Amino acid sequence: MADFELKVGPVEACKIDYSKSIEELNAYYEDLAKKIAGGQPELANGEFMQLGYALDFLDLVKRVFNMDIDFEETSIPKLDQIIAALSQAILTKKIPPEAGGDIMKKASGFLSVIIWKNIGGGFISSNIGYGVNINGTNAFVYNRIGRRLQGDTSCDVTSFYEELKKL
């Protein structure tokens, strides 16, 4: 069996001001997306991508669950409930498996933004997914969300977030 080697890129410092309202963050994202499409691809980075996923997740939750959530810590228990419901829908094949990957990206972006806004840290990418770096510790948000969506109830978001706050 081949040895596995974890490869993590350098930590990217967060450049987005998460103290802004959701409307302001949405406008910022749309403005930057236009600049990128208009010939400034250097503006695209992992943090920008995660913000886009996070904003998409807000829209998904509003449409599917008729629930408003935001980037505050108070949304963490709600996120656990949403992920549990989505997990059940995936496991019972009410949601096609290919949609699970899209949901995982969006939920990961959402949780990453909550972390950056309320705890701090930077963005990381690796050969096992995206994550955050807090005080030198890498936390793989994408994998945590993925395991929870696949039915691993030990991978709840609340305990993960509380552990990150201790770093």
Predicted feature locations:
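Compositionally biased, intrinsically disordered low-complexity regions enriched in proline and serine
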Residues: 19, 29-30, 54, 124, ...
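Arginine residue identity/basic-tract feature
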Residues: 63, 106, 144-148
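A recognition module on extended beta-rich or small alphabeta surfaces enriched in W/G with H and D/E
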Residues: 26, 129-167
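Amphipathic, interaction-prone secondary-structure segments
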Residues: 93-137
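Generic structural signal for hydrophobic core residues of well-folded globular domains
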Residues: 83-86, 114, 118-119, 148-149, ...
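Generic alpha-helical secondary structure signal
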Residues: 22, 32-33, 57, 114, ...
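The feature captures two recurrent sequence modes
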Residues: 1-101
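Short non-domain terminal segments
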Residues: 2, 69, 121, 138-140, ...
